[in-house]
Amino acid sequence: MKHTAISERAKEEISSIRVGTSCKIVLVSPDDIPYIWESVEPHLEAMEPHSEGELAPEDFYEAIHNGEMQLWLAVEGKELLASMVTQIVTYPRKTILRIISIGGDNMEKWLGYIPLIEDWALSMGCTSLECWGRKGWLKVLKDWKCSYHIITKDLTSRMH
C-alpha cells in the first residue's frame, strides 16, 4: 500500500476524537502542517536528546507533509498539550503502527487517547503498535510489553 493511500484513508477515518471532557485528539492533515508547525516543533525538539540522532524535527516535517508519517495533537481549548508522530510500517508478515515520537505536558489529560489510536491503527490494517521510547513508558503503558532492546554503537569516530 502506498503512503498516499494511507494518508487518504487516514483523513477518511478520523479527524477529531474527544478524550474525556476537555481534551481531544486530532489527526492533522498533511496539508495543514505548515500552519501549525511552529507550535508542534518544540515537542519534537524535546525528543532529540533522548534519541540516537535518527530524526530531527525537520525530518518529521517532510515525512508528515508528504504523508509518510502522521501527526497527532492533544489539545484542550486553544492549548496544545502534546504531539505524537506515528508511521505505518509494513513488514513482510505484518503491518504495525509505530509511535516514533510522543511528548508534551499534562499526560494525565491525554494518555487516555491511546485506545483510540489503537482503533485507528486497526482500521488502517495494523495488527499491533510499536513505540520508540524510553523505558519509563512501560510504567504508564500498562498493557504493553518490552519485546526487545535495541543496542547501538556509534562509528562516526572511525570515519575518515
What residue spans do the PLM features occupy?
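Active-site/acyl-donor-binding loops of N-acyltransferases
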Residues: 2-10, 131-160
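Short amphipathic alpha-helix that is part of the acyltransferase structural core
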Residues: 2-55
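A residue-level signal for beta-strand positions that form part of recognition/binding surfaces
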Residues: 22, 96, 148
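Active-site rim helix/loop that mediates acceptor-substrate recognition in acyltransferases
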Residues: 50-69
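Short, solvent-exposed loop/turn elements at beta->coil junctions and helix N-caps
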Residues: 59-61, 87, 136
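Structural motif
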Residues: 64, 76, 119-121
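Conserved donor-binding loop and adjoining core beta-sheet/short helix segment
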Residues: 66-107
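Acyl-donor binding region in acyl/amide transferases
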Residues: 92-143
